[in-house]
Amino acid sequence: MPFSLGQRWISDTESELGLGTVVGVEGRMVTVLFPATGENRLFSRTEAPLTRVIYNPGDTVESHEEWKLTVTEVEEKDSLIIYHGTHSETGEQVSLRETLLNHNIRFNKPQDRLFAGQIDRLDRFNVRYQCQLLRNKLATSDLLGLQGPRVGLIPHQQWIAHEVGQRFAPRVLLADEVGLGKTIEAGLIIHQQLLTGRAERILVIVPDTLRHQWLVEMLRRFNLRFSVFDEDRCVEAYADHDNPFYTEQLVICSLDLLRKKRRLDQALDADWDLMVVDEAHHLEWSEEAPSRAYQIVEALSEEIPGVLLLTATPDQLGHQSHFARLRLLDPDRFYDYEAFLKEEDSYKDVATAADALASGEILSDESIAGLTQLLAEKDISASITLIQDDAADADSRFQARDELLQDLLDRHGTGRVLYRNSRASVKGFPVRNLHVHPQKMPEQYVTAYRVSSMMNKHLDTNAKVRQVLSPEKIYQDFDSGSAAWWKFDPRVDWLIDFLKNNRSKKVLIIASQAETALSLEEALRTREGIQATVFHEGMSIIERDKAGAYFAQESGGAQALICSEIGSEGRNFQFASNLVLFDLPLNPDLLEQRIGRLDRIGQKNDVEIHLPFLANTAQERLMQWYHQGLNAFECTCPSGHILFNEFSGELLESLLNNDEAVLESLLDGTKARYQELKVAMEQGRDKLLEINSHGGERANQLVKTLADKDEDTQLIGSVIRLWDIIGVEQEDSGENAIVLHPSEHMMFPTYPGLPEDGITVTFDREMALSRDDIALITQEHPLVQTGLDLITSSETGTTSVAVLKNKALPAGTIFLELIYLADASAPKSSQLYRYLPPTPIRVLLDKNGNNLSDNVTYESFNKQLSAVNRHIASKLVNASQAILHPLFAKAESFATTQLETLTECAREKMTSQLSGELERLKALKAVNPNIRDEELSHLSEQMAELNRYLDSSQLQLDAIRLVLVSHA
């Protein structure tokens, strides 16, 4: 290369150094100073990775004094370039020597990089284009946020997430029965809200015992990095901000932290977009005295636009508290408890009509009359005629039924606020089998009972019942807490024998008290050396997690996990199928929560429930009431709380007094009332709610679409090529898994999300679900998203030169391929990307400026191209400059026409979708008060805002490829 002092060159490998100046030429070496950074580089004269910077007429250049010149003539004198042209501010004719060019010049624009000789490899151009297409495809997907999480494709979960996650500031109560996956539903909604930009700051409030579990679940299943906040974390955060909650976007904390006024005030001031409250059945409310927990959540719900409340047992604290939770979501709608009860009574007619439609049978005259009355504001005669016509197309009849069903659900009930799936409507649950193991009452307990009944006559009935249900507690209190009751309790003997006979099986043991759980662990360890671990409220979160992990460990792990009552809230152990209830809780909902730790979707075996109890005691009578009265062991009992409230007086009396006649009367009365409630619930509001909550055929179709996306082999190829280009080491580990490692030769110094010690990934959902240590890769995974961002936000692949070997074309024929992006800058929260995301526009010109892109596809053209080395590529560009400059203007004209078309299509799509939804909601609001005013005003504002953004849409040249025909 001919070098002379003062010439300007740019580094091909370190373009961030800016414009360099030759300051030394000695022998075989050349020294270049890069004034922008103050660094010198020494290069070999024959192999220097440098490109000479020479501008052309029409270009604008900047002097070191920051004035600009539009070049009209380029003169070379003594191996240096002098630019002649027009001063941009004064209009005068001026000259500028290349030594006086601005040092900070960056060749960021594709055309600048092309003419400066900064030409990328052919495969990088291709990967960049594929990345832009992939980003566009992801942004326009109606299922954005649903595919990425590592969860099973379960219809009702995906349906609820799809329905709720697309709303602006959703405010809903997720109340699926135990085991149906409320946490997953909430995670899917959170994931959607974040990916779509509808939410950025999220506060999750959970019981103290579940903080770490939520942290792990959000990361492992949803790739969301939450931070757990406690008092210590808040104190540490003061170093960064006066309000600790502003130091993180995604926060998990407990209600206990927010009981402190200072922390609550800070949380209220933290500008959250979405609040999630788990175990919301603990929020007790009465009109006269709402609980402190309720008041905290109420204050936050008044400040935070989006609210998700999670509970498996809506009525655990009574129907009033259930109403109060709905009141948190929409106080204007749920303003009066008595009015709410009257409205619930009216749901029966709606459910009857919905049943008639859902059955698929010919509608009776009574059903038609009911539907006509319920949908009086709409003419449904054509739909009814179609449904009743046996000769009509089956799909058309189904669609007519479905539309009327949706009209019913839209106009009546709490369908937009409350989602509750029952096991009756969801498939995939195991059989539950009860095994009772009566044991003889030991004399030690008989004595302790006798003494306790004499000494504790002052106790109220509830306290007395709790005592007789836990004889070991009475005995310990009786003997000053030092006695080892487990040495003589026959239930412990049975438990040891059971574990010894089932050594290969994992067993979950639940007892009411932490002291009981600890004593059982001691008994198993000291008497038989059985490996067991304990889980109780006195342990730290990390200790509980370790206990859970030790139990889950297949090889060398604990055979048994012994939980106190907290073990039946929030923790799931469906890898085990044997449950031992060492005692029974005095609450049907708590019993269901215990069983629900194993009886969940994903449980592959029947759940075996073992109940050792002391015969002829309160334990046996409570077992009989649960089993014979409620059938609560082998089936879920949605009416359990109602029955407990109605029969609690008789039940408590029966537990305290061993009277067979009282027990028989109690069991008969409970069974009869249970059947009544079962029939009433079938006929009433719950059935309507189920139809809306599980999604029916629509949910099945949604899951099928997601499953089809999982099989997209094109995505797999694109992602593998992306990692190849970046320089990620990929090692096949068999079983559809790949181990990724950062390499020393990666294109970028860091790859966020790729650990130093590597990560194992798979594109197979089933494998990812079966292996916690393997990440599921979809187009939504952070490793893919980050990889796309690394490529598209850098200069990688913005220029390329290739050769087309085709003897049917004259040698030397030129083609210019340009990739533009149609873009309208807008905040993510505006949802503009749904209508006009950055969209690649391809223009392929011949030397005469004809656009061939409609006739020559990218794929067919790309397959015929061959790479050329960089030195030859630079020469080809320089030789073609006179032809190329006019082509750029023509290409932009073609692209502008396409931009206008895209913008108008986006506007039509936006107007059609949003105005249609707005009109639908306005019509519904007249008959269903669950439609919030905020939703209507948000849609109107969003339409106006999107129109403004679309008006400012523009083109951006993203990449250029020069192609020359060769016969060589």
UniProtKB/Swiss-Prot annotation:
Q: Which UniProt keywords apply?
A: Activator, ATP-binding, DNA-binding, Helicase, Hydrolase, Nucleotide-binding, Transcription, Transcription regulation
At which positions is ATP bound? D176, E177, V178, G179, L180, G181, K182, T183
The record's section on PROSITE patterns has: HELICASE_ATP_BIND_1, HELICASE_CTER
Q: Which gene encodes it?
A: rapA
GO biological process annotation, one example: regulation of DNA-templated transcription
Family named by the database record: Belongs to the SNF2/RAD54 helicase family. RapA subfamily.
EC number from the UniProt entry:
3.6.4.-
Lineage, broadest ranks: Bacteria, Pseudomonadati, Pseudomonadota, Gammaproteobacteria, Alteromonadales
Pfam name, any one? Tudor_RapA
- What the protein does? Transcription regulator that activates transcription by stimulating RNA polymerase (RNAP) recycling in case of stress conditions such as supercoiled DNA or high salt concentrations. Probably acts by releasing the RNAP, when it is trapped or immobilized on tightly supercoiled DNA. Does not activate transcription on linear DNA. Probably not involved in DNA repair.
Residue span, Helicase C-terminal domain: 491-678
Q: What name does UniProt use for this protein? A: RNA polymerase-associated protein RapA
